[in-house]
């Protein structure tokens, strides 16, 4: 059993690998791989494991796409591929030729996926129905050989989205309602098949979950954005043949009215709400859903106990533009027209059998009324389908409400919901036949368009009121204007008389003023002439002043240029004076130096003493003259130049004498220097000879180095040639590995084909054993054995042709695709016990652990973890995994990935390691137990199942050691808080997980050292409950034995 749990994900990974390989096959290839959810199914091993990993939690009346065993791809495999001696008979149902008739009732079918209970109970049986959505057909199995085929307008698998269902079923009806036609959308089917989910799901948290009601109103409100369309709704339920208002629960037992002339059905007492937007509708719909009757049954946790009818009234004005253009016209063309349409969305309560649904008490009465109304509806459908003259619509209030939907003037779309389980064969057949009969009904679709006299009346009344008010306003305005004009006329007459008097007076005054102004104007002309003459004179003076101003500016420019030149000249003179002063100071310094030198040579230069005194006197006189002539630049410069020349002549003479003396002294110094230089040359010559010798030595060293370099060059050339040969060899090896990889893929496809054939043989075996007896079962078991032997032969041939060592080498490839395919093959091989030893001997465990530690690819992590889980079933592999730190590495995987499939594989591997007594303490030290508890926090039912299995294995091994006397003290699990976790999860829905938790609690309770912890956590009550309610006899017996023998529990 543990082998099937640990290797199921490996089979899934191998399936995906084969699909990936098949994508690269040419389009016309004959090697197509047939895959299903049971590909690569290998023999199971016995251990404490979870019986299934691919469980799906069942939500309230909701189709789920997570269950692979209930997908249509499995059940849609062609029966012709299965080997059977009995031919398969298929009976075709009549195809409907009037698909384009807009009045025909459109019928669609939707299949609910298997729930968790059906996955366990129906695991060995094929699906009851087989869907063919491409050709819009459904096959219903009668038995293993016979099936009936039915055609529908739409066929939806269990993976179909809510949006796709709405667009296929309801959207054409909604569009017709917007165009003015009545419409009906209805869901019919057995209880628990997803009617309320399909029609009435609100989808508050997830918009993708919204049902037909919400999506239909969303489309209608989107088109009703203009003011010409109004949308109103009413929401009723038919509960036990009583019509109740879901929007006003106090309204009970509302009556139904029928118009004798038109035959229209109405419910006048229902609450009608004007819908503004989608949020408003969702609030109203939530109120109605809250008031609807529901109950918990065996087949559905929230089973609807009433028929819900949502009625949407759409009113649309047709000539809005004409009314705006001619608001006052009263002709026939001005009468507004309106289109009234009505949409019924009906969520029927599910038909059910009391013995299967487990109803009792008041729910039996509810079921009677539900079945009664549905029976009446079925009778009406039968009568309409058969063309009967009498339609029994008055047998039930439901048929009266739906009178216009079947055989009336509405466009009707029916969706029937069915389940995949064979336990409800009769209910599924009845539902399908109901849909087939409904497809024969053709309604007379009519467009309801009428004159809107009410709107016209209101508009005319508004116009009359407006015109009356306008006439009164005009009369008042006319009277007020008349009084105002009379008043203004009187004022004008008075003002005219006064103006006439003022005009006569003013004319006399103006004549006098005119005479005075003429005289003053003549005087002003004279003054103007005088000012003109003065202006000409001033103009001439201005011209003269301008000329003077130009001359003045020119003189100023010349003066400024002169001043600039003067300033430059003065600066030049000052620089020259400063230079002469500096030269005089330099001469004084030189003279003083000469004095010092002459005093030292008195015997030789005695004749120069007088000249030196005269020079000092001349210098004194020169300085005095220089001070006197500071204000006269030119004279002072000339005198200074003369004195300077004389002083230079004298100083030159003195310098000549000094040079002669120095020359004598320098001759002696030159001789001594030549001696010194000769000595230095000798020393340098010796150094040069030494340098020559060292140079010769270095030259020899360089020659030796050069020879070494030549040898190294030859060696490097040889290494380069060797590297080229190695590269060529590696290229050949790479090509060889690629060819081996292609062989590996080919063998993998053959293996999968064999496994697929084995699955078909297994299904046929299970069916044949139930119907054909022992003889047919034995024949098919022999075929199954042959298929299994063929599979083992294929795996053996795969190992022999390619070799496990080469496959493990491909795991280290840099090509990610090659690496993924290689690890999938290793995982597939690891599921076979014969290959596990070879993988361990070839270093497969080290390679997989290294891959898990270093890789970041989710696919590699998932498949490698599955391979490790398979290898962990082998004792030798367990030793190697623990010695290489595999437990700690697996425990840390919870921080590396959150993929539930990967974590399930890791939990399965740790659970297998928990079954070895040698590693209990080491698993705790390397945080293996803590890692399992951390993985259980994900909430995934499959991961929790593996964690529970691991705890049961650990507790079982501890109990065995304690009974054999090899261990004492509290359980290691209690130190990690496992007891609290087991207690809190002991009521989990999964039967296998609950069994493992019960086993773990019983094994822990056998150790008396754990008694205080059981009392502290309240787990004793769980032991008591297990002794009474456990589904396994052996577990109940063990719990009772513990309660009797343990004094701490009995007290």
Curated annotation (Swiss-Prot):
Compositionally biased intervals (Basic and acidic residues): 753-766
SMART domains noted in UniProt: ARM, KISc
CDD domains found in the cross-reference section: KISc (cd00106)
Coiled coil start-end: 452-534, 568-761
Subcellular location as annotated: Cytoplasm, Cytoskeleton; Cytoplasm, Cytoskeleton, Spindle; Cytoplasm, Cytoskeleton, Phragmoplast
Domain Kinesin motor: 104-441
Superkingdom per UniProt: Eukaryota
Disulfide partners: none
One protein family per Pfam: Arm
Record's comment describing the protein's domains: D-BOX motif functions as a recognition motif for the ubiquitination machinery.
Role this protein plays: Acts as a plus-end microtubule-dependent motor protein. Involved in the control of root hair tip growth by promoting microtubule depolymerization and limiting the accumulation of endoplasmic microtubules. In vitro, binds to polymerized actin through ARM repeats, and to polymerized tubulin through N-terminal motor domain.
Entry similarity comment: Belongs to the TRAFAC class myosin-kinesin ATPase superfamily. Kinesin family. Ungrouped subfamily.
Protein name as it appears in the record: Kinesin-like protein KIN-UC
Species of origin: Arabidopsis thaliana
Organism lineage: Eukaryota, Viridiplantae, Streptophyta, Embryophyta, Tracheophyta
């Amino acid at each position: 059993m543990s082998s099937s749990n640990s290797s199921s994900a490996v089979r899934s990974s191998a399936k995906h690998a084969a699909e990936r390989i098949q994508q690269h096959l040419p389009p016309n290839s004959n090697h197509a791989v047939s895959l299903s959810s049971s590909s690569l199914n290998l023999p199971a091993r016995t251990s404490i494991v979870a019986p299934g990993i691919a469980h799906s939690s069942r939500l309230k009346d909701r189709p789920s796409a997570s269950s692979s065993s209930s997908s249509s791809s499995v059940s849609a495999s062609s029966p012709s591929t299965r080997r059977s001696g009995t031919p398969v008979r298929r009976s075709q149902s009549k195809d409907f030729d009037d698909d384009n008739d807009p009045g025909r009732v459109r019928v669609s079918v939707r299949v609910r996926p298997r729930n968790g209970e059906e996955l366990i109970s129906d695991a060995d049986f094929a699906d009851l129905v087989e869907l063919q959505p491409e050709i819009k057909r459904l096959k219903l199995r009668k038995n293993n050989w016979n099936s009936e085929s039915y055609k529908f307008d739409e066929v939806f698998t269990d993976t179909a989205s809510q949006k796709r269902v709405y667009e296929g079923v309801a959207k054409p009806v909604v569009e017709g309602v917007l165009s003015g036609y009545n419409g009906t959308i209805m869901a019919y089917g057995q209880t628990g098949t997803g009617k309320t989910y399909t029609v009435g799901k609100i989808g508050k948290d997830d918009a993708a979950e919204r049902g037909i009601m919400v999506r239909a109103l969303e489309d209608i409100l989107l088109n009703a954005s203009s003011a010409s369309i109004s949308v109103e709704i009413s929401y009723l339920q038919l509960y036990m043949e009583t019509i109740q208002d879901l929007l006003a629960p106090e309204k009970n037992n509302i009556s139904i009215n029928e118009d004798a002339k038109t035959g229209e059905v109405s419910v006048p007492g229902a609450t009608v709400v004007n819908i503004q937007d989608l949020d408003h509708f969702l609030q109203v719909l939530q109120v109605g859903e809250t008031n609807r009757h529901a109950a918990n049954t065996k087949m559905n946790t929230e089973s609807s106990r009433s028929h819900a009818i949502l009625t949407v009234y759409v009113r649309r004005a047709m000539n809005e533009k004409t009314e705006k253009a001619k608001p006052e016209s009263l002709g026939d063309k001005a009468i507004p027209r309106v289109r009234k349409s009505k949409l019924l969305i009906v969520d029927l309560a599910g038909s059910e059998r009391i013995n299967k649904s487990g109803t009792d008490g008041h729910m039996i009465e509810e079921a009677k009324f539900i079945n009664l109304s549905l029976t009446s509806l079925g009778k009406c459908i039968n009568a309409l389908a058969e063309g009967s003259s009498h339609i029994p619509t008055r047998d039930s209030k439901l048929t009266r409400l739906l009178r216009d939907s079947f055989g009336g003037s509405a466009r009707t779309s029916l969706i029937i919901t069915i389940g995949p389980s064979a336990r409800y064969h009769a209910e599924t057949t009845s539902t399908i036949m109901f849909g087939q009969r409904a497809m024969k009904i053709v309604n007379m679709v009519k467009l309801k368009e009428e004159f809107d006299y009410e709107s016209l009346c209101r508009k005319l009344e508004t116009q009359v009121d407006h015109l009356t008010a306008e006439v009164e306003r005009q009369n008042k305005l006319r009277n007020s204007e008349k009084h105002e004009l009379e008043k203004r006329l009187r004022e004008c007459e008075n003002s005219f008389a006064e103006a006439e008097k003022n005009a006569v007076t003013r004319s006399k005054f103006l004549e006098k003023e005119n005479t005075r102004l003429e005289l003053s104007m003549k005087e002003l002309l004279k003054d103007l002439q005088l000012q003109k003459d003065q202006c000409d004179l001033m103009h001439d003076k201005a011209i003269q002043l301008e000329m003077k101003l130009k001359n003045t500016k020119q003189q100023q420019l010349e003066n400024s240029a002169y001043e600039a030149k003067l300033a430059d000249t003065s600066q030049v003179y000052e620089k020259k004076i400063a230079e002469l002063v500096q030269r005089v100071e330099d001469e004084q310094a030189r003279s003083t130096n000469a004095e010092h030198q002459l005093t030292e040579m008195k015997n030789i230069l005695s004749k120069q003493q007088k000249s030196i005194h005269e020079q000092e006197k001349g210098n004194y006189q020169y300085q005095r003259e220089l001070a006197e002539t500071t204000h006269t630049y030119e004279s002072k410069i000339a005198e200074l130049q003369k004195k300077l020349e004389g002083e230079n002549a004298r100083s030159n003479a003195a310098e000549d004498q000094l040079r002669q003396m120095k020359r004598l002294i320098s001759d002696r110094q030159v001789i001594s220097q030549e001696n010194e230089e000769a000595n230095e040359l000798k020393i340098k010559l010796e150094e040069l000879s030494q340098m020559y010798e060292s140079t010769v030595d270095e030259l020899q060293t360089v020659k030796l180095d050069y020879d070494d370099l030549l040898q190294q060059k030859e060696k490097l050339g040889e290494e380069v040639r060797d590297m080229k040969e190695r590269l060529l060899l590696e290229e050949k090896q790479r090509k060889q590995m690629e060819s081996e990889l292609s062989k590996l893929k080919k063998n993998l496809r053959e293996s999968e084909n064999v496994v697929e054939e084995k699955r078909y043989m297994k299904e046929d075996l299970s069916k044949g054993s139930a119907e054909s007896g022992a003889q047919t079962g034995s024949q098919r078991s022999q075929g199954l054995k042959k298929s299994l032997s063929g599979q083992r032969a294929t795996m053996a041939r795969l190992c022999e042709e390619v070799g496990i060592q080469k496959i493990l080498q491909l795991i280290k490839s840099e090509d990610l695709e090659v690496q993924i395919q290689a690890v999938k093959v290793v995982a597939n091989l690891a599921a076979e016990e014969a290959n596990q030893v070879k993988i361990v001997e070839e270093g497969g465990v080290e390679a997989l652990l290294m891959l898990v530690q270093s890789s970041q690819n989710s696919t590699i992590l998932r498949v490698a973890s599955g391979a490790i889980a398979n290898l962990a079933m082998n004792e030798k592999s367990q030793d190697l995994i623990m010695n290489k730190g595999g437990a700690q590495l697996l425990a840390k995987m919870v921080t590396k990935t959150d993929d539930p499939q990967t974590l399930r594989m890791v939990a399965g591997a740790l659970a297998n390691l928990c079954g070895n007594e040698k590693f209990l303490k080491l698993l705790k030290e390397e945080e293996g137990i803590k890692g399992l508890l951390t993985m259980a926090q994900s909430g995934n039912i499959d991961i929790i199942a593996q964690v529970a299995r691991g705890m049961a294995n650990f507790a079982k091994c501890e109990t065995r050691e304690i009974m054999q006397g090899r261990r004492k003290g509290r359980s290691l699990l209690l130190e990690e808080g496992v007891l609290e976790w087991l207690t809190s999860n002991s009521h989990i829905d999964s039967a296998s997980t609950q069994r493992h938790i019960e086993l773990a609690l019983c094994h822990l309770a056998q150790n008396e050292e754990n008694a205080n912890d059981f009392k502290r956590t309240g787990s004793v009550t769980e032991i008591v409950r297990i002794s009474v309610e456990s589904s396994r006899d052996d577990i109940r017996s063990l719990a009772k034995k513990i309660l009797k023998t343990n004094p701490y529990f009995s007290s």
